[in-house]
Amino acid sequence: MKNARIVILYYKLSFLILFLLLKSALLLATEDVIYNLKFKQLSAPYSLPTNEVQKVYQDKDGFIWFATRNGLCQYNGYETTLYKSNLYSPDLLTTNSITCLVDDNNNHLWIGTSEGLNVMDKRTGEIKKYKAPYLSNNVVSALCVTRDNTVWVGTDNGLCRYVAEKDTFVVCGDDFGDSRLRYVTIKSLLEDSDGDLWIGTWAQGL
C-alpha cells in the first residue's frame, strides 16, 4: 500500500513538473513573439499624403485603405495609390479629409468625409457623391454595412440608412426608428453576431 502511494505521488509530481515546463516554454515563446514584432512606417511624403491617418481599413478584396486628412490611399502590399481632389481633379472627392471607410457586397467603397459621403465603384474608379439634404448632416463619422448589405451612415446629426432601390437615404427618427437618435452625433457603428446594430454616440451613450 505504501509503495502504491509512492508511485501515485511520483506520477503527480512528474505531471506537475511537465506542466510547469510546458507553461514556461509557452510564456517564453509568447514573449519572443512580442519582442520580435517588426514595425515598418509608411509616412509622408513617400507613401502617404500626410501623417494624419484617421482610419485603416481592409476591404473584401484584401486591399488596405488609409483614410487621411489629405486624401484616400489604397495599398496593395507594394505601393500606394492616392485619390484626392487637386488642381487636375478638383471634384474627385467632396473633400480630402476622410473620416471612415467600409465596402459593401457590390464592389462599392463607401467613403465618409467631413463634407459628405463619397461612393467609389472599385471596378471603374468612378465616385458618386452625397451631401445634405440627402444626408442628415455632411459630417460623416461612422459607416457600417450589415450582413443583408444595408449601408448605415452615422453623422454629426443623426443616423441614416441607404435605400438602394431609390438611391436615397432615410433618417432615423424622421422616417423610421427611435426619434431619440434624430439629432444625436453618431461616432461608431457595429453589427454583432446576432444581427443587432450597436450605435456609439457623442455624450448620449450606446
Regions found by a protein language model. Name each.
Residues M1-L206:
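Carboxylate-rich, polar loop motifs that coordinate divalent cations or form catalytic acidic clusters
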